[in-house]
Amino acid sequence: GKVEFQGKKTKFDSDDERNENGAAGPVKRAREETDKEEPASKQQKTENGAGDQ
């Protein structure tokens, strides 16, 4: 299922740029859900051991 998560991450990555445009609300929420499902994404974003949480 890593491939599926990677695809999702790419989608969020694209939305991340739009998120700065003023869509931080929905995008941030979706990202949080993804982070919970794939800790690897969180690790790459924070690299602060967030994957442990």
From Swiss-Prot:
Residue positions, PTM Phosphoserine: S14
Domain of life: Eukaryota
Keyword set, alphabetical order: Acetylation, Nucleus, Phosphoprotein, RNA-binding
PTM sites of type N6-acetyllysine: K8
Subcellular location: Nucleus
Presence of keyword Nucleus: yes
Residue numbers of Phosphothreonine PTMs: T10
Regions crossing the membrane: none
GO cellular component, one term: nucleus
UniProt PTM: Phosphorylated.
UniProt-annotated stretches for the region Disordered: 1-53
Example GO molecular function: RNA binding
Coiled-coil residue windows: none
Chain intervals with Basic and acidic residues compositional bias: 1-13, 29-40
Function: Binds to the 3' poly(U) terminus of nascent RNA polymerase III transcripts, protecting them from exonuclease digestion and facilitating their folding and maturation.
Name of this protein: Lupus La protein homolog
Species per Swiss-Prot/TrEMBL record: Oryctolagus cuniculus (Rabbit)
